[in-house]
Structures are given as C-alpha cells and as structure tokens.
Amino acid sequence: MRITIAGKIGSGKSTVSSELSRITGYTVYSSGTFFRETARKMNMSIEDFNVYSESHPEADYYTDETQKAFMQANDNIIVEGRLAGWISYLNGINAFRIFLYATYYTRLVRFAGRENIDIDSARDLMEKREKSEKERYRKLYGIDVDDLSIYDIVVNTEFMKPPEIAVYIANRIDEMSRKDIFTPRILR
C-alpha cells in the first residue's frame, strides 16, 4: 500500500509521517527533505530556491518526477509532501491520500518554532512560500492545491498529538480497506 500525506506548511506532515511509519513499518519519502537538499546543493535558502523555481520549472519537475518514480517503484511506503497526493492522483498511482489541516495561526506558530524565528518573520516567509508554491503548481500542473476533493481523508491536526493522529489514520485505512470502502480514485 502507498500512503501520501499532504498539507500546508506547519500542518504536521513530517511528524505524522514519522509516527505513521513507526506504526506501519513503511518507509517514509519526504519531498520537502529532497527539495531542501536540492536547495542546499545549489547554495540557496528555501525561499531563494522557491523564487528560483518560479522561473526555472525544471527544479519542480525534477523533484516531482523523482517523487513519482519512487511511488511507482515502491510499495508499503509513505510519501510526504505538499504535492504527494496530487502527484499520485495525476499519474494514476494507487495510493491512500491524506491531507493534514491546521489553522493558519497554529501552522504559523509551528513554523516559527521549527525555523527558530519570530512570528513576524515566520509570517512573511510562510506567506511568500505558500503564494509561490500555489502559483507554480497552478502554472505547472493546472491544479489548485486547496482543492481537497482528491483526498480519501482530511485530518485536523489542531487538537490531537502526532501519535494519536497516526493511530487514527492507520485505523481509518484499516477500516476502509476491510470494508472495501477504499477504492483509490485515479484520474483517467
């Protein structure tokens, strides 16, 4: 089984993916880690690499094609990233698609803590990054990243701890699979 976990900045994608991996034993592939590593290799910050990617679509294509190839070649995996669900959907890859949701303020606080910066700086960075990503993905793939209709489950991460969220997701996948409710939606 393939599981994709998507969500906006600070929604808990990486943390929940790690917890779900602990429960399932599945390997986690993080497109965010790959994107950050590519930026680092180019001696750029994430923000600079986002700006670079706006005029160099090959940067996004490279990241997304790597993610797609990994999904196609592997099973029993968790693929975590902003576009993970969309990449599986657009490429007809059978996957259980999860979207993690949190309010803007919660995401902002989490992002500031993760980056070890003040709230105002976090707000500026988060808004620039999300605006850049939304516009790039619309131009590159014709998708609206705020369209949640492709997801099998949307989870609010506000009020549960990551281990609880992972258990909830694992239980929902198991329940839907056993009842044969889960029929992955594949774009044709």
UniProtKB/Swiss-Prot annotation:
ATP binds at G7, K8, I9, G10, S11, G12, K13, S14, T15. It comes from the Archaea. It catalyses: CMP + ATP = CDP + ADP; dCMP + ATP = dCDP + ADP. It holds the Pfam family Cytidylate_kin2. It is an enzyme of class 2 (transferase). Gene3D superfamilies: P-loop containing nucleotide triphosphate hydrolases. Its main location: cytoplasm. One of its GO terms (biological process) is pyrimidine nucleotide metabolic process. GO terms for cellular component: cytoplasm. Keywords: ATP-binding, Cytoplasm, Kinase, Nucleotide-binding, Transferase. It is found in: Cytoplasm. GO terms for molecular function: ATP binding; CMP kinase activity; dCMP kinase activity. Its EC number is 2.7.4.25. InterPro entries: Cyt_kin_arch, Cytidylate_kinase_dom, P-loop_NTPase. Belongs to the cytidylate kinase family. Type 2 subfamily. NCBIfam families: cyt_kin_arch (TIGR02173). This is Cytidylate kinase. It comes from Thermoplasma acidophilum (strain ATCC 25905 / DSM 1728 / JCM 9062 / NBRC 15155 / AMRC-C165).
